[in-house]
Amino acid sequence: MASRGVNKVILIGHLGQDPEVRYMPNGNAVVNMTLATSENWKDKNTGENKEKTEWHRIVLFGKLAEIAGEYLRKGSQVYIEGSLQTRKWQDQNGLERYTTEVIVNIGGTMQMLGNRNSNSHNVTLNENNNIVKTKKIEINNSPKKIEKIDSSEIDFDDEIPF
């Protein structure tokens, strides 16, 4: 079976502004939003901590767009799974412009992440633009007790089981 390629983008970040909700002539919702992802590192020469933030344009369609418009706000942390798409248009001066966006459509995922004390909601759409999975994840922050195990008590079997 020949592969035609894979176009999948996974991002976790924070919204830079409230989602912008619009409706197409057929009544389907479309949301445009910007998502910031950051990476941190230590400069080898100065020892100084550095940070680089990358901004991503995200476009959601259908029910995911409606949910994002209702529940997400500037600063919300969100997990996005979609595909990368570049489109071209002409600006007011007739110049060709390009933009690259992460499209979250059929088969895409948006998961609203929260702080440590909030719950998380996961929403995925199938081919018919129907929500196929919504789950609430309870976050338990209680500390776990770790018991020390004496390595002399562990019975290592020298034989490989296959």
UniProtKB/Swiss-Prot annotation:
Output the Gene Ontology terms for molecular function.
Answer: single-stranded DNA binding
Q: Keyword DNA damage, does the record have it?
A: yes
The keyword DNA-binding is annotated on this UniProt entry: yes
Q: Which residues bind DNA?
A: 55-61
Q: What is the superkingdom listed in this entry's lineage?
A: Bacteria
**Domain SSB residue range list:** 6-111
- Kindly state the positions of the motif Important for interaction with partner proteins in this protein: 157-162
Q: Which Pfam families match?
A: SSB
Query: What keywords appear on the UniProt entry?
Result: DNA damage, DNA recombination, DNA repair, DNA replication, DNA-binding
Q: Which GO terms describe its cellular component?
A: nucleoid
Recorded hits in PROSITE patterns, A to Z, give: SSB
Q: Which GO terms describe its biological process?
A: DNA recombination; DNA repair; DNA replication
Q: How does it assemble?
A: Homotetramer.
Biological function: Plays an important role in DNA replication, recombination and repair. Binds to ssDNA and to an array of partner proteins to recruit them to their sites of action during DNA metabolism.
What is this protein's name?
A: Single-stranded DNA-binding protein
Q: Which organism is it from?
A: Buchnera aphidicola subsp. Schizaphis graminum (strain Sg)
The gene name on file is ssb
